[in-house]
């Protein structure tokens, strides 16, 4: 009898206990979890940097292309080889082993969005450090955009009606209301935009990422030294921890191609 009484008591207490331990946002997200528009988004610099990180992940130089089998130079013995399937009738818009458009064009979308968000995001409390972060991240974006434009032209430029065409040039962030049915710009226009972006990257970025020693303040570029930037803050932005990111030397190599 006592056991039955205990069970009944627990059954009556459970709903009351649930009211004390349940989350008030179990069914409606808490306000702080809802990011409404650019104003909320830019307050989280790591989220803004994720736009740039997406482009680094899609880096067209990060993988080897074994496309010899897409020509008569080689043939695969593997039945499921994508190039072999392509040659035997499986090539379509939804199954294209040669596709580079999606990743290259998609990364430019992210880079354009980053350019809008970078100046609005609080990267540092010190004004000069904030300026350095904005310049570095913007320079990376311009350099990456030049790189992706280069590979878009390599893969998708061509002749049409006797004219050498490139790809549509899109420099602004896109929304669901943007015009996506854009004509291709000429190859020359795309080339000029590539050079323009590469030049901006060269202007904004350093040749290489190195940590300055405490007695090397004289190596801080005059632009930042004039703003009172010290070695510690300079290394925070331009130090060796960013060695694998876009720099002026890489931008020059892109421009040279």
Each language-model region and where it sits:
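Conserved, well-structured interaction surfaces
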Residues: 81-158, 176-192, 199-206
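Well-ordered alpha-helical segments within folded domains of soluble proteins
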Residues: 107-115, 169-170, 249-254
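Aromatic-residue-lined binding/catalytic grooves and analogous aromatic/hydrophobic interfacial grooves
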Residues: 23-26, 162, 195-217, 221-224, ...
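Membrane-proximal, proline-rich intrinsically disordered regions
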Residues: 22-76, 81
